[in-house]
Regions:
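Long, non-globular targeting/processing and low-complexity regions
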Residues: 1-114
Length: 114
């Protein structure tokens, strides 16, 4: 019984600490447990909106090619944002596509503005 009480008490303390952290800095330490998924979840909706606004594309690309690249980035980040066992059970083709999307994200990082 004491163990259950301690666990419950620890959970309450942690929740309060995380609440205080969110109030004071806008995020809490739990977001660093799987920073990859946290960042992906943060980026995906913004990247989708960036694509919707369609305010240009890199000089060396066509608008169609740029949209395909953005789609690959979005696919990769959505896949990583899931943070579930299924992402580790995915096929080799999916992992290859995710890797390609992440590489494109890095390559075109400097073009994500308008």
């Amino acid at each position: 019984m004491k163990i259950l009480y301690r666990l419950k008490n620890l959970k309450i303390k942690r929740s309060l600490r995380f609440f205080y952290q969110k109030l004071t800095r806008g995020w809490d330490d739990s977001e660093t447990w799987n920073l990859e998924a946290t960042l992906a979840r943060h980026i995906v909706p913004r990247l989708k909106r960036f694509k919707e606004l369609n305010n240009g594309y890199p000089q060396e690309l066509t608008p169609e090619a740029w949209n395909e690249i953005l789609d690959e980035m979005i696919f990769a980040l959505e896949f990583r944002a899931r943070d579930t066992e299924e992402q580790w059970d995915a096929s080799t083709e999916e992992h290859t596509r995710v890797q390609k999307g992440l590489e494109l994200f890095g390559k075109y990082w400097g073009h994500l503005w308008w």
